[in-house]
Amino acid sequence: MRHNKSGRKLGRTAAHRKAMLRNMARSLLIHERIRTTEHKAKELRGVVEQLVTLAQTDSVHARRMAYKVLENHQLVARLFNEIGPRFTGQPGGYTRVVKMSLPRAGDCAAMAIIELTKLAGAAPAGQEQAPKDASSEA
């Protein structure tokens, strides 16, 4: 019986699943938004949340822990210098999974978009862009 077993197997061996989640975490941290199946997105969420939590404490040990997953010095530097400071003071919820309305064409798999909640070019939550006045365009 499979009672109380957390995590999805995703139809892969343990090594393949680990490699796939590492690659997807790299892609998400580079592009900040990726499209994948719903179940993969939900599994990836936990990996990326742990990495962003690590990035909030900038220490050598935290960088080495992140490097164990990412295996890329430039990406670790980006995680700790750009992505981590964006979420300072936020106790979780760094990613969002948005379900897409149409399934994948080939096998009808449920698709989703996983993204960081605070994207790179977005304005902070308290500062919205003021709409332009029509009278000032003279």
From Swiss-Prot:
Entry keyword Transit peptide: no
A GO biological process held by the record: translation
GO molecular function: structural constituent of ribosome
Regions crossing the membrane: none
One of the record's GO cellular component terms: cytosolic large ribosomal subunit
Superkingdom, natural source: Bacteria
Stored SUPFAM superfamilies: Prokaryotic ribosomal protein L17
Entries under Pfam families matching the protein: Ribosomal_L17 (PF01196)
Coiled coil, from the record: none
Record's keyword annotation contains Signal: no
Record-linked InterPro entries: Ribosomal_bL17, Ribosomal_bL17_sf
Keyword line: Ribonucleoprotein, Ribosomal protein
UniProt family annotation: Belongs to the bacterial ribosomal protein bL17 family.
Binding partners and assembly: Part of the 50S ribosomal subunit. Contacts protein L32.
HAMAP family, alphabetized: Ribosomal_bL17
PANTHER family named in the record: LARGE RIBOSOMAL SUBUNIT PROTEIN BL17M (PTHR14413:SF16), RIBOSOMAL PROTEIN L17 (PTHR14413)
Record's protein name: Large ribosomal subunit protein bL17
Organism per entry: Solidesulfovibrio magneticus (strain ATCC 700980 / DSM 13731 / RS-1) (Desulfovibrio magneticus)
Taxonomic lineage of the native organism: Bacteria, Pseudomonadati, Thermodesulfobacteriota, Desulfovibrionia, Desulfovibrionales
